């Protein structure tokens, strides 16, 4: 039996001899010594016989490292140190090392480019400014070949279309928004061209298309699609307004700026802080000479030219400033030393509020001193032109120029020469003013200013489109209503509501006409709450004792004028009066006596079952009348045989009525009613030979002039009723 001992290991090898473990340690040590990494950089892994706590702790450390790597990968970009952004040392370190100093130093965290032939920080992808240069024909010998950069589309309409034969079109509500297109045919060197300007809310496109090889001119939608692939299925309308050209040229040139304001900051030797720059009050002779080169020193009080935001009335922004005109443009300079100085204000806000709101500024350096673009905190300053005088005090001093701007600002001309040194004279002034003007135009293309410009362009384009459309329709003699129906527009909620009301009124009138024709012999059921008519005709009978006679008159037309349920008739009669102004039915108040004795009759007004009926009584209390008769009791008349007469049919219903003494009416002057009993067969009292049917006859004030008083008719008929009842009893 072998006497070799074995040791237990928690590694992945199970049972391992100690001799084998020792040999593994030796090999691992040799590998560690042979590698380039040092022991602290590359620690040895724990031995295979290490306790589990030691291996688990290293395992968790490895997990933490892996999680840290994953978190770094999930970040938008690698976190760089300040040294990764600084191509030069900080300005304090540069000043401590001593001169000569560079003119411009990139800020610690970047964000700017420097135009310098020897500097790799100048952006090369942009190449040149996106602004188009003016035509060379406009350049004079005094410009020294320096061109002003501006948007060619802004002046194209005035240069090529205004005052010449051309056509304008507008498109409403496309996927690209409102569009306005101008087209003109022209010929150059024997070749025909089609010059087109297409305006959208995003941009304005100006192109010249050759027509060689085309059998006919392309249509306006085809021209629009040639400029933009998304312009599909568009419908253009011609602009028919004599003054449309002036409106279009005003829109195109809203981006053209003929007034500029630039800041001028005086930087002395070894000044590296914003407070130090704005705190300078003295002007050196070299700085005064430079200001004289820029323009004329003017007095602000009552100044009539472009003031650039300075006070010309109360003198709150200083006494003097520098002003000049350049190629039909006005320029006002905000000179830091000429703006008001406030004692005790380290930031000098009276100066910074003007220079800080400028877009381009000049940094004049008295001596060789570095400048950092982020030295001045401002949201508007996007470009700086640094000018350093090299030979001050001489008759023709020289100036060294450097240009820096933010990264989102495209490059602008004229380019700096190599070396960038100019002699004092008209050429340097021409270069400097041209560079300043082009710098501001280029800064307007940066992200911050471009968003503002896009919103302004879209609003102005929509306004121009609406005005052209309105004037075109006015020239055609089309109003807003005709224009909407012509274009198929619904006109909004209000127009839809008006049309619905008109259709409803027309349908109501048609229904009323049909009701009159179908119910010419009786009462319309819709007016009495939907009550069905009996087969027998409505009769009107006078009492002639002792024999009851009925005279039947056929009506040639309906006695009821149907009124719309939307506008029920208003009752203005007083509620306190005792006269009944509603349809009433006679009801027996006491049971009939066997011997045919006296019975009292109570007549109560009933409310119609139709709430929209025009004859509804507004009184809640039911007025009643009691009639004592010696004759037989009058049975309650059926509602199916009751008839209602309105003001429209009253004339025919009252033709055979007996006339009585006229009495003043106590009812409302707007409506008068007559209560008439006409005997007719009743289904409820078959034993009686005749039953009294009450009839409500309404009278209007107009009919009362030619008719007898309804109150007298009521009294006369009640007298006849009493006389007939007494005669039958005897």
Curated annotation (Swiss-Prot):
A single BP term in Gene Ontology:
regulation of small GTPase mediated signal transduction
Name a single GO cellular component: nuclear membrane
Kindly report the protein's main subcellular placement as a broad class: cytoplasm
Provide ranges: composition bias, Basic and acidic residues: 618-631
Domain (Rap-GAP): give its ranges: 248-464
Q: In which tissues is it expressed?
A: Isoform 1 and isoform 2 are expressed in platelets with isoform 2 being the predominant form. Expressed in lymphocytes, heart, testis and pancreas.
Q: InterPro entries this protein is in? A: Rap/Ran-GAP_sf, Rap/Ran_GAP_dom, Rap1_Ran_GAP
Which parts of the sequence are annotated with region: Disordered? 32-53, 509-533, 552-730
Q: A GO molecular function for this record?
A: GTPase activator activity
- Indicate, by first and last residue, each region the UniProt record lists as having compositional bias (Low complexity): 635-647, 678-687
Q: What is the effect of changing residue 7 to A?
A: Abolishes phosphorylation by PKG/PRKG1
Tell me the residues on which Phosphothreonine occurs: 49
Q: How is it modified after translation?
A: In vitro phosphorylated by cGMP-dependent protein kinase 1 (cGKI) at Ser-7; the phosphorylation probably does not regulate GAP activity.
The cross-references to SUPFAM superfamilies, in alphabetical order and at most eight, read: Rap/Ran-GAP
Cellular localisation? Cytoplasm; Cytoplasm, Perinuclear region
Identify the keywords attached in UniProt to this record, alphabetized. Cytoplasm, GTPase activation, Phosphoprotein
Q: Where along the chain is composition biased (Polar residues)?
A: 585-613, 661-670, 699-712
Q: What role is this protein assigned?
A: GTPase activator for the nuclear Ras-related regulatory protein RAP-1A (KREV-1), converting it to the putatively inactive GDP-bound state.
User: What's the protein here called?
Assistant: Rap1 GTPase-activating protein 2
**What organism does the UniProt record list as the source?**
Homo sapiens
Q: Which gene encodes it?
A: RAP1GAP2
């Amino acid at each position: 039996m072998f006497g070799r001992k074995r040791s237990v290991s928690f590694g992945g090898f199970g049972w391992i001899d100690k001799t084998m473990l020792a040999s593994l340690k030796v090999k691992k040590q040799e590998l560690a010594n042979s590698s380039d990494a040092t022991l602290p950089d590359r620690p040895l892994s724990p031995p295979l016989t290490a306790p589990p706590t030691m291996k688990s702790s290293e395992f968790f450390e490895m997990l933490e490292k892996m999680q840290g790597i994953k978190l770094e990968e999930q970040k938008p970009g690698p976190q760089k140190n300040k040294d990764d952004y600084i191509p030069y040392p900080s300005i304090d370190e540069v000043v401590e090392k001593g001169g000569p100093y560079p003119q411009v130093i990139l800020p610690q965290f970047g964000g700017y480019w420097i135009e310098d032939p020897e500097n790799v920080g100048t952006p090369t992808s942009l190449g040149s400014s996106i602004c188009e240069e003016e035509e060379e024909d406009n350049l004079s010998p005094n410009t020294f070949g320096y061109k002003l950069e501006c948007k060619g589309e802004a002046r194209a309409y005035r240069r090529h279309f205004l005052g010449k034969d051309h056509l304008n079109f507008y498109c409403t509500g496309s996927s690209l928004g409102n569009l306005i297109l101008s087209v003109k045919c022209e010929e150059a060197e024997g070749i025909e061209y089609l010059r087109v300007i297409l305006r959208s809310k995003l941009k304005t496109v100006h192109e010249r298309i050759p027509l060689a090889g085309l059998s006919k001119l392309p249509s306006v939608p085809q021209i629009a699609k040639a400029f933009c692939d998304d312009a599909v299925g568009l419908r253009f309308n011609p602009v028919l307004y004599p003054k449309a050209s002036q409106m279009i040229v005003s829109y195109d040139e809203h981006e053209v700026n003929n007034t500029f304001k630039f800041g001028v900051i005086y930087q002395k030797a070894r000044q590296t802080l914003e407070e130090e720059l704005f705190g300078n009050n003295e002007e050196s002779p070299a700085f005064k000479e430079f200001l004289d080169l820029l323009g004329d020193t003017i007095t602000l009080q009552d100044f009539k030219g472009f003031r650039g935001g300075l006070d010309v009335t109360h003198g709150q922004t200083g006494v003097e400033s520098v002003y000049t005109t350049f190629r039909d443009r006005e320029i006002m300079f905000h000179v830091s030393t000429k703006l008001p100085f406030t004692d005790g204000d380290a930031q000098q806000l009276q100066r910074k509020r003007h220079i800080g709101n400028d877009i381009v500024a000049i940094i004049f350096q008295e001596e060789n001193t570095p400048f950092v673009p982020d030295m001045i905190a401002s949201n508007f300053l996007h470009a700086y032109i640094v000018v350093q005088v090299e030979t001050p005090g001489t008759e023709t001093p020289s100036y060294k120029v450097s240009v820096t701007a933010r990264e989102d600002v495209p490059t602008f001309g004229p380019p700096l020469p190599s070396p960038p040194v100019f002699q004092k004279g008209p050429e340097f002034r021409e270069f400097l003013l041209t560079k300043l003007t082009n710098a501001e135009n280029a800064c307007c293309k940066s992200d911050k200013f471009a968003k503002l410009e896009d919103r302004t362009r879209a609003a102005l384009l929509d306004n121009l489109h609406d005005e052209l459309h309105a004037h075109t329709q006015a020239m055609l003699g089309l109003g807003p209503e005709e224009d909407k129906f012509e274009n198929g527009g619904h006109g909004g909620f209000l127009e839809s509501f008006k049309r619905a009301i008109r259709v409803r009124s027309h349908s109501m009138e048609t229904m009323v006409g049909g009701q009159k024709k179908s119910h010419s012999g009786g009462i319309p059921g819709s007016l009495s709450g939907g009550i069905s008519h009996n087969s027998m005709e409505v009769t009107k009978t006078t009492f002639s004792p002792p024999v009851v006679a009925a005279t039947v008159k056929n009506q040639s037309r309906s006695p009821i004028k149907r009124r719309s349920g939307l506008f029920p008739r208003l009752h203005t009669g007083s509620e306190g009066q005792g006269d009944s102004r509603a349809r009433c039915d006679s009801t027996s108040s006491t049971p009939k006596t066997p011997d045919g004795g006296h019975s009292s009759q109570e007549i109560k007004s009933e409310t119609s079952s139709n709430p929209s009926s025009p004859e509804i009584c507004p009184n809640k209390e039911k007025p009643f009348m009691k009639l004592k008769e010696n004759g037989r009791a009058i049975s309650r008349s059926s509602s199916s045989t009751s008839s209602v007469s309105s003001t429209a049919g009253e004339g025919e219903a009252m033709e055979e009525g007996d006339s009585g003494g006229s009495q003043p009416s106590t009812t409302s002057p707007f409506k008068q009613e007559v209560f008439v009993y006409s005997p007719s067969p009743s289904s409820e009292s078959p034993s009686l030979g005749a039953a009294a049917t009450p009839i409500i006859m309404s009278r209007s004030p107009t009919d009362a002039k030619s008719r007898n008083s309804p109150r007298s008719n009521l009294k006369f008929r009640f007298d006849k009723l009493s006389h007939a009842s007494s005669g039958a009893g005897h």
